[in-house]
Each structure stands twice: as C-alpha cells, then as structure tokens.
Amino acid sequence: MQPKTQYMERFIMQDLIAWKNREDRKPLILLGARQVGKTYILKEFGQREFEKVAYINCDNNAMAKDLFASDYNIDRILLTIGAITGVNIEAGKTLIIMDEIQELHRGLASLKYFCENAREYHVAVAGSLLGLALHQGESYPVGKVNTLEMYPMTFEEFLWARGFKQRMDLLQHGMWDVVKSLRTLYIQHLREYYLVGGMPEAVNKFIETNDANAVREVQEEIIRAYEKDISKHAPKEQVVRINQVWNSIPSQLAKENKKFIYGVVKQGARAKDYELAIQWLIDAGLVYKISRVKTLGLPLKIHEDISAFKLYLLDCGLLGAMSKIPPAMLLLPSNDNTGKGDFTENFVCCQLESLRQILIYYYSKENSQLELDFVIQAGMQVIPVEVKAEENLQSKSLKATIAKYPGMKGLRFSMSDYREQDGITNVPLYGARGYLETFI
C-alpha cells in the first residue's frame, strides 16, 4: 500500500479564498511548473470551501475531448461536465476544476464565455505546460480571467509542512531576538531545505522517510519528467538547444560571474541561436530569468539591459540533484565554500520569486568589479542585495553602492544574525522571504 500523502499548507490558499469571495470574480487560471502542487491545492481548496467539486483531467478523460468542439453554450457545457463527473453542479456551491486545460481544443477560449454568461459559477483551470500554451498562440481570453501563479514550496512552507508553524511565524513577524535564540535549529532546517527544496513530492518523501537518498531519487524523477516534456512538447527544431541550455545551468551558476554566457552552452554559440530555447524554459516555469540593470533608479524596468541576464533553476533542491552535489555536502557545515555561493543565490532567488509584488534584477557595469547579486524594487523602494553563503559580512559592492546613492539602504542575506549597521541590514538567509514580506 502506498503511504498517504499528508496535507501540506500553502500560502496560495489564502489567494484562492480571496478569489472565491471577489464580487468581480472571473474564471481562474492557475499557472506554475509541473509538480509544484497545482492540482493538489485546487482539490484541497474545493474540499474546504465548497460543498462539491467537479474535477476533470482533460488529458486522460476521453469524454472531455469534445467538450467545446461544437459551441460555447454554457448550459450544455455545464450539463456535460456534470455528467462526466457525476456531480450536480450548482452555482456558488460547486468548484469546477478543469486540469490540463491546454489539451482541450478551444478550452482556454471557453473561459471568455464562462466570464460573460456564467460568472456565478466558480471555474478554475490549470495545466502543466499552460504557460507555453499562452505564449505560443493559444487563444487567450484577454480581460476575461483572473490568474495566479504557483511556485515550489518556500522555506517557510517547508517549516509549516514539518509541523514548525511557530518557527515560521517568528520569521514572518520579524521577531529576530527570539529567532537568534533558535539559530542552531533554523540553520539545521535551512540545510535540510537546501537538500530537499520545495517540490511537494520531495518534501513529503523527506517527512515520511527522513532519507536523503530517497529524496534525491524523487528529485531525479522530477528532472527526468521535465526532460521528457522537452522532448515531447518543445518544437522539434528546438529540442536539442533547449536541452543544451537546461544542462548548462549548473555550470552557468558555478562561474564567479553568473551572467549567462552562450559559449558555456556550446562553443561559438550566439544569442540568436538560443533565444527561443531560453524562452521555452521560462514559459514552462523551469527557470527564472533575472536581467541586469545599469542604474539604480525608479522604475528599474526602464534601466533593464535585456542582453545581460542570469538564469536560475526553479528549485534549489533540483539544482542540487542536477549538479550531483552529495547530500552530505548540503546537510553538513563546511569551511569549503566551493559551490556554495551559486547554490545560495539560487535559494534566495526562489524565495524572492515567490513574492509576486516585487521586481527582481541584478546590477553590474562593464569594466567594473562592482556587482550586486540582486536589486529589488518593492513599491517605491529600490533595495540593493548581496548574498553570502556563510557568515562573511564583507560587502564591498554593497557599501560602495549605498555610498553612491545617499539614502539608499542595503540588504545582505547571510548565515549571520539580524543586525543593522552602517546603512546595511543583515538578515539571516532563513529569514529572507519573511523579511521582504514587510515591504509589500
């Protein structure tokens, strides 16, 4: 008998509840990479908040294939969904979930008609490669849908899943004196998260077994599933190039200068040869593209240099598996910092990406050693950020930046405790997301 997957709380549940209660609610599109928990959270949301759930997997349900083939008559569609699922659909009482919606001909386009003619019904759709469908010409119901994006579990959600909600709350409320007294525990949890990452199946395996090797097997299966998606769903002429970019990511991040270099992918490679491959990985939700800015002024977007960027993997646990980092190297403290900087940056990037209300860039200038790992725009604030893998508090670039921009406050994430000194706030790595939540 397979062990039962335990329920793991996700922050996005509150966003789903808010969507349910909106007076101007439209059909919901839930975006996110494969295996981040979209289906799971929608079903749990339905069970908690509705009397009934009508769930259809559009990929493997033959009866659903022609659901929208003839017309968009909502009464007929609702009757058919009810017949397929065995659920008597009632407005306000039933959550309709159409999973893998991109597999249905005209499936996404149908949401326009749900919005215009049946807004009293709660309709939510998801799909493993829905981001690709939306960017590759699939008819998109502009202005007729609400969207949410789901990410791998954050470090805080990892604590919550393991039964340490109080420790999560301390980080979210910035109770740094108490956090400091629990420093050893937080560092242990962080190193475990470095190993496990935030893919729900890997987290659940860790909770069930406490076995690093079992977790790594799950991660390797997820990576293989992503690579199968590339072979199956990517344009045939792009498959080789997508795989080349994908496989180069650990090497790209291991460089001292983590700017994406096409020559690392293939000797003599040029941007125009790989732009579509990179965009495919972004649209699939597998990588985060962080562009460079040359000036730290509001809004950061107008200072973006689209020709210079870094690519980070969607999950630090998967990066560890792709990089073949021995689990013990992630779990145990070490004086050897080889590989730690890139890994820690990827961790921070993932935590930042889960905060949808901030914009993320990095800062550097040609012919200069001054570089900032990240620059964040949160509301009316521009925040320069440096990331340190351990307790090293030297921050030459950060200090030079705040000296150049009077009034600007620097932010450093490291293994050291919370402190404010000389215009720089040091936040422990395990408190990165919780600290930035106070800005949004």
Describe each PLM feature range.
Residues I207-E371, I376-A378:
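Accessory nucleic acid-recognition modules appended to NTPase machines
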Residues Q2, L134-A254:
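Interdomain motor-coupling "hinge/lid" segment immediately C-terminal to the ATP-binding subdomain
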Residues K38:
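Conserved lysine of the Walker
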Residues I97, H122-S128, E149:
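Structural recognition of the conserved hydrophobic beta-strand(s) that form the central parallel beta-sheet
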